[in-house]
Amino acid sequence: MKKQNNLRSLAAQAVEQVVEQGQSLSNVLPPLQQKVADKDKALLQELCFGVLRTLSQLEWLINKLMSRPMTGKQRTVHYLIMVGFYQLLYTRVPPHAALAETVEGAVAIKRPQLKGLINGVLRQFQRQQETLLNEFATSDARFLHPGWLVKRLQNAYPTQWQRIIDANNQRPPMWLRVNRTHHTRDGWLGLLEDAGMKGYPHPDYPDAVRLETPAPVHALPGFAEGWVTVQDASAQGCAVFLAPQNGEHILDLCAAPGGKTSHILEVAPEADVLAVDIDEQRLSRVYDNLKRLGMKATVKQGDGRYPAQWCGEQQFDRILLDAPCSATGVIRRHPDIKWLRRDRDIAELAQLQAEILDAVWPRLKPGGTLVYATCSVLPEENRDQIKTFLQRTPDAALSETGTPDQPGQQNLPGGEEGDGFFYAKLIKK
């Protein structure tokens, strides 16, 4: 069993890999969790997610309390001090334990000579905490978002940007999707209650259930048997707008990790579904999801810009394009997004989205439906993207979602407690 004081150093290393090396926390965290006892996995996750959620504040505090930054091989200590601040500010770890374990973390990262420095900075913070937090409350860092993203949100949502930022800074609820081929939603809610848990149905998405309190999946009735899947309510809107029917040929493009593929098959079990994604590693999760749910689909690796490479001349009755995007609508669920994205990424993503739309549109049958979806809240990837697509595509018409001047439906994070999501339903004339 690993010593618990390794948790702080592991959390510091994880955050450093995200911020300094641009790695996704979902890739960094699992191997680190293998290094700690089962009872400590939740705390390690809390420290990593929490530090990334509040990184602006923790960085601001370090700049106030240290005369010069830690650089080079000492850089991990910079993030170790952040882990200490986070514990003192946001967790129920007793302050004396937070200090002691964080200071000991210096030994684990082979910087024992800096134990005194870490201890001194954390104790100085304790002494000045009230004054520092009052000053922080009026600083630009208080939004806990990078400045470029704050500006984009202010421009796009002059009256709602603060609400979006506040929602992004909250912990996300746990949403589930009841597999209608096994149970009705009300029937499964009864099983959940029998298991001592409570859930609430979504008013618009017929399979969605929000847990009153998040729970491990193995505690959910029938999870292993495929009765229920973890999926945010807003993501479930994709299949609602797509409205798949049995017997149809359906393309799920950019399909990994397969949550929407399986939802399509739950709604239309006799549909012929092709799931395509460019990332071969992530496609393994599509197979895993289909296997757990006992479903079958054709799964291929491919680039959405070149459909001839993965489907020849085949045409489809319905296409779901869950386009690659900035993921600015799911920041509360993936706080590392704030520090992985750059302002310049948005134009590049919008260009990629346009190329995929143009490439895949000819593969839709006349009278067919294409649902364009993103987990972004930025208009360049959403409303503006569809507006320009409609202008250059005479045989495309908007259906159900918005108007030609304001196309699509934009869900903001926290609305009905779902993530930020955009949908545009297009019909081929």
From Swiss-Prot:
Homology family: Belongs to the class I-like SAM-binding methyltransferase superfamily. RsmB/NOP family.
Top class in the EC scheme: transferase
CDD domains: AdoMet_MTases (cd02440), Methyltransferase_Sun (cd00620)
Subcellular location: Cytoplasm
Sequence ranges of Polar residues compositional bias: 400-412
Domain of life: Bacteria
PROSITE patterns in the record: NOL1_NOP2_SUN, SAM_MT_RSMB_NOP
GO CC terms in record: cytosol
Binding site for S-adenosyl-L-methionine: 254-260, 277, 303, 322
Chain spans, region Disordered: 397-419
Major localization listed first in the record, in broad terms: cytoplasm
Keywords associated with the record: Cytoplasm, Methyltransferase, RNA-binding, rRNA processing, S-adenosyl-L-methionine, Transferase
Gene (name only): rsmB
Cystine pairs: none
The protein, known as: Ribosomal RNA small subunit methyltransferase B
Coiled-coil region list: none
Enzyme Commission code: 2.1.1.176
Gene Ontology biological process terms in this record: regulation of DNA-templated transcription; rRNA base methylation
Protein role: Specifically methylates the cytosine at position 967 (m5C967) of 16S rRNA.
Source organism: Salmonella schwarzengrund (strain CVM19633)
GO molecular function, one term: RNA binding
HAMAP family: 16SrRNA_methyltr_B (MF_01856)
Reactions catalysed according to its record: cytidine(967) in 16S rRNA + S-adenosyl-L-methionine = 5-methylcytidine(967) in 16S rRNA + S-adenosyl-L-homocysteine + H(+)
SUPFAM superfamilies: NusB-like, S-adenosyl-L-methionine-dependent methyltransferases
Location of the active site: 375
